[in-house]
Amino acid sequence: MNIIVVGLSHKTATVEIREKVAFAPTQMEKPLHALVSLPDITEAVIVSTCNRVEIYATTRDIAGGVARLKRFLADYHNISLETLEPHLYSYHGEAATRHVFRVASSLDSMVVGEPQILGQIKTSYGYAAEYKSSGIILNRFLHKAFSVAKRVRTETKIASSAVSVAFAAVELAKKIFGDLSDKTVMLIGAGEMCELAAKHFINTGVRGVMVTNRTFERAVKLAEEFDGKAVNYEELFDHLHKADIVLSSTGAPHFIIGPKNVEEVIRRRKMKPMFFIDIAVPRDIDPKVNDVENIYLYTVDDLNGVVATNLEQRNKEAEKAEAIVEQEIGQFFKWLSSLEVTPTIVALRSKFDEIRRAELAKTLANWKELPPDAEKRLEALTSAIMNKLLHQPTSVLKRAEQGNRNDLYIDALRNLFELETTRPEVEELGELEE
């Protein structure tokens, strides 16, 4: 069985492309069930964040599985595959494992070391577990990814020198306005990114924070944490003119702020400049807003410029993290290979031993008088012959296991000898590692 990855990220696709293939976190049941209904796709997990959309799956047919996942992404979102394919990447085997371990460890993030991606993958895995689209392989695979990320976080200082996307947004605001002590911030959304942004804005000494959210109680809760003010979502445009900086991160499927809204707001501000940061995918703010005078709109892609200057220390820590990833890849593949190889070897030996015992029993039944130790000697002789015969195929299978080339041999043996194998039980892992 092979692990495959198909997806796109901020490295291969603009926000305009990414938002077209984003999956709503509250509507994962349908696409997950559709994925595991595809031919040869046995398990699947969808990871959909601001900066990436990826599908992790298991299949016996690598080329066919990758093609089906690409077609699924295009068809599910009503996009032509010709439009989407240039932005897609795919991995299988060791490369897929390396990619997911690196993603979970934030080594592939826009901001290396940011902690949000691990939580996002855990949430994605939670949906797959809830809707039963993940199984023995992806369960173990993602728990391994979580433990790799934990090792990276505890054994390196990669997180200590990292800046999150939310922090990058604050840094961008400082570049636009300079001193933020007389500025008021409006947060649209009350999720993790807005909470992080609120912390960073408060630390820079902004004058005040307003929070609005479709669920007013969540807005109140976040606002209270920072001595801010909660605003009813329906009254957003009654209060927007009071904000100098607006950061939006909701899960809305369409624009919630357009140019006409902003034209009215800027008039009420007597043309005082406003800074909008849209870190939602799909985007919350119509890009035409940027055409309004004295309005400055930035998206998640614009944050690349803020975070492009990686510190030397972070790069050194990233090298340590990469070494951890490489070490863990080998350990995971040893387990994955044994999942197929060990039961096959056991089944092969069992089949041969069954035949040996049956034939030996027939032979002994036809001999009326035997020396006292004859049965014991014949037992040893036939066992030795069987072991000699099985030594070479067993050795080849074990060598193939180490080289990750075992599927061909396993399938051949199962077909030639009509083997029935049962995978070994894998211990159920409890709570997700923090």
UniProtKB/Swiss-Prot annotation:
InterPro entries: 4pyrrol_synth_GluRdtase, 4pyrrol_synth_GluRdtase_dimer, 4pyrrol_synth_GluRdtase_N, GluRdtase_CS, GluRdtase_dimer_dom_sf, GluRdtase_N_sf, NAD(P)-bd_dom_sf, Shikm_DH/Glu-tRNA_Rdtase. GO terms for molecular function: glutamyl-tRNA reductase activity; NADP binding. Substrate binds at residues 49-52, 109, 114-116, 120. Its EC number is 1.2.1.70. NADP(+) binds at residues 189-194. GO terms for biological process: protoporphyrinogen IX biosynthetic process from glutamate. Keywords: NADP, Oxidoreductase, Porphyrin biosynthesis. Gene3D superfamilies: Glutamyl-tRNA reductase, N-terminal domain, NAD(P)-binding Rossmann-like Domain. Disulfide bonds: none annotated. Pathway: Porphyrin-containing compound metabolism; protoporphyrin-IX biosynthesis; 5-aminolevulinate from L-glutamyl-tRNA(Glu): step 1/2. The record marks 99 as: Important for activity. It is an enzyme of class 1 (oxidoreductase). It catalyses: (S)-4-amino-5-oxopentanoate + tRNA(Glu) + NADP(+) = L-glutamyl-tRNA(Glu) + NADPH + H(+). The active site is at residue 50. Belongs to the glutamyl-tRNA reductase family. Catalyzes the NADPH-dependent reduction of glutamyl-tRNA(Glu) to glutamate 1-semialdehyde (GSA). During catalysis, the active site Cys acts as a nucleophile attacking the alpha-carbonyl group of tRNA-bound glutamate with the formation of a thioester intermediate between enzyme and glutamate, and the concomitant release of tRNA(Glu). The thioester intermediate is finally reduced by direct hydride transfer from NADPH, to form the product GSA. Possesses an unusual extended V-shaped dimeric structure with each monomer consisting of three distinct domains arranged along a curved 'spinal' alpha-helix. The N-terminal catalytic domain specifically recognizes the glutamate moiety of the substrate. The second domain is the NADPH-binding domain, and the third C-terminal domain is responsible for dimerization. Homodimer. This is Glutamyl-tRNA reductase. It comes from Geotalea uraniireducens (strain Rf4) (Geobacter uraniireducens). The gene is hemA.
